[in-house]
Swiss-Prot record:
Source species of the chain: Cereibacter sphaeroides (strain ATCC 17029 / ATH 2.4.9) (Rhodobacter sphaeroides)
HAMAP family: UPF0125_RnfH
Positions of disulphide bridges: none
Entries under Gene3D superfamilies matching the protein: RnfH-like
InterPro entries according to UniProt: Mopterin_synth/thiamin_S_b (IPR016155), RnfH (IPR005346), RnfH_sf (IPR037021)
Protein family: Belongs to the UPF0125 (RnfH) family.
Protein's name according to its UniProt entry: Protein RnfH
One Pfam family in the UniProt entry: Ub-RnfH
Domain of life the protein comes from: Bacteria
Amino acid sequence: MIVGVAYAKPTVQVWKHVDVPEGTSAREAIERSGLLAQFPEIDLEVNKVGIFGAICPLDRTLAEGDRVEIYRPIHPEAELLEKKR
């Protein structure tokens, strides 16, 4: 089955389609996507993940067409940084 795995930084957005077997977890899809190697700052013990904008545990079983999103931690000064842009 095909699922998406997405990660975004302020300057780069990546969305990969990954072919995974039935019963694959969010963690397994992220690992298969190659994003952990591409973005070494991703720490699955720190970064939250979700499916279509809803936070979920890493062991959540995926369905065909799900989009797994890896969220960056909120920076305490994010609001100030946004105003500077």
